[in-house]
Amino acid sequence: MVKQLKFSEDARQAMLRGVDQLANAVKVTIGPKGRNVVLDKEFTAPLITNDGVTIAKEIELEDPYENMGAKLVQEVANKTNEIAGDGTTTATVLAQAMIQEGLKNVTSGANPVGLRQGIDKAVKVAVEALHENSQKVENKNEIAQVGAISAADEEIGRYISEATEKVGNDGVITIITIEESNRLNTELELGMQFDRGYQSPYMVTDSDKMVAELERPYILVTDKKISSFQDILPLLEQVVQSNRPILIVADEVEGDALTNIVLNRMRGTFTAVAVKAPGFGDRRKAMLEDLAILTGAQVITDDLGLDLKDASIDMLGTASKVEVTKDNTTVVDGDGDENSIDARVSQLKSQIEETESDFDREKLQERLAKLAGGVAVIKVGAASETELKERKLRIEDALNSTRAAVEEGIVAGGGTALVNVYQKVSENEAEGDIETGVNIVLKALTAPVRQIAENAGLEGSVIVERLKNAEPGVGFNGATNEWVNMLRRGIVDPTKVTRSALQHAASVAAMFLTTEAVVASIPEKNNDQPNMGGMPGMM
């Protein structure tokens, strides 16, 4: 395919147009008075959302150079979402501000490499200051506040807080899943999660979220390595007749077996998801036994003289639902015998009391939390399918925010935390282009507050200047147009979300500014010839 090139200023300006188009579509959603964006869906009803990463993913521009600029900002949103689960709109606003300000300086003759050094230096200081200002999440109310701010809905914050309280939040495990329902409520169901994901992305059932969701699946539990498809074919034939999906938990599924599972999944013959067994060595065997007891399965192992070729469907476990991501597998409401589960829990508690090894005790406590902690299910209801999708997205963001808050604490919300570190960053000693790079970050730190104010119908510059001179923690409440102590009022953001947004925005901005040439494919022209007209008198 023939390529075309642009260099220097031409290249950067073309990409900037793409950055601005995407960022302008996303930033209207930031803050309590942010608006929604309607996304056209080819085969379903339009999706109405204010989720930054969802909007960013939908944007594809006709001009290849503009599209590359948009894709760079998409990467900011995706990375922030991947690490922190929220804050994608903030990251987009920060990236646009840094790119716009940086490009002005490059056009004026600044050296992009020096600017990059200054940006990196300023962001490092800002992140350290954010951690210094961070406060731990200590109670149910603070979790509810984080969820409510993220979802812009106090009711959602309350339900997430209740769900977190039900599963416990001791730092070992917090499992909450979201299901569709006719009303909003939370339930605690028996289940477990382990840190192993699907062995092939072709196994997913939802390509948008890259998740495999299995309803009422059979569960095969084995410590064997499955290489030959023939070894599991008799068992899979029985599963196919039942018209139910299957989760295969094994030492590893590889070669011919993995290939055939993927091919049959793509053809629609059956739905199967293969994941590696959790843990290692003796601990792996114990965790497989935990899973088998929870789901009512029989572990297929040489220790019991069992072979995969002889396995029957009654050796499989079952559960009401299984959700598999690229990193984790969550089993909800296994059909194991309650007495057997209680006996296993008692056994684990006894082992925890008897062991003298701190490491073994920690691992046993993890297993106990997985087995006895349960899975909180938030059931989401709405009046229409469009509203349901939008509400699920908001709850997912809020849930990710609360997890991030538990990990690294909270800071003042509404963009206040970024302006609070302004003074610390400005004290950085630097010269020349490095100093200019620091100033680029300083201006960007005020961008989220500025946009929140503008979305509320106010002059952003006035709000920013007043905030710079306010006491630490005091900020602008965009919902009421009041100046309040953000932490006391419960207007908070997870430190991890704010930090990730700033770091990823700076990373992409630095790459953008140091770009000197852009190579793009030339779109192929449509060479279809027009139809020939008929001869006179011909039909």
Swiss-Prot record:
GO cellular component, one term: cytoplasm
Catalytic activity: ATP + H2O + a folded polypeptide = ADP + phosphate + an unfolded polypeptide
Residues noted as binding ATP in the record, renumbered to the chain: T29, I30, G31, P32, D86, G87, T88, T89, T90, G414, D493
Induction / repression: By heat shock.
Annotated EC: 5.6.1.7
GO biological process: protein refolding
Record-stated family: Belongs to the chaperonin (HSP60) family.
Protein name: Chaperonin GroEL
Organism: Staphylococcus aureus
Lineage: Bacteria, Bacillati, Bacillota, Bacilli, Bacillales
